[in-house]
């Protein structure tokens, strides 16, 4: 995984996501999930392209089950975009890079 992608856990979620001074895109995933693996290159590309403007992270739902339950994650992949500590966009299923970029750009205006 790219060094630009932050590993998010139940333990660091508040600091990395809710208290971040820039928007944060969190990919809720699991290793056994085929569609989640399809998103890996897209997530890594977005992390590089938006470095310094948006924090991009991944949270493994198998190893961290408190945070997904707080945000009503019932299917993966789910991507949630957070801004100022609030979930502002929730997308379930595999999304195109174009769709994810549009969601990010809307929050950067």
Where are these regions (language model features)?
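Conserved helix-turn-beta segment immediately C-terminal to the redox Cys motif
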Residues: 21-23, 38-59
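Short pre-active-site segment immediately N-terminal to redox-active cysteine/selenocysteine motifs
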Residues: 21-22, 28-32, 75
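N-terminal targeting signals for export/organelle localization
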Residues: 1-4, 109
């Amino acid at each position: 995984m790219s060094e630009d992608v932050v590993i998010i856990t139940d333990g660091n979620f508040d600091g990395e996501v809710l208290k971040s001074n820039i928007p944060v895109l969190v990919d809720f995933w699991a290793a056994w999930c085929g569609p989640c693996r399809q998103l890996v290159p897209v997530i890594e590309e977005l992390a590089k392209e938006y470095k310094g403007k948006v924090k991009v992270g991944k949270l493994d739902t198998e190893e961290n089950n408190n945070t997904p339950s707080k945000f009503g994650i019932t299917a993966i992949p789910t991507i949630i975009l957070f801004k100022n500590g609030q979930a502002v966009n929730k997308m379930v299923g595999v999304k195109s890079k174009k769709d994810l970029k549009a969601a990010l750009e809307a929050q950067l205006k």
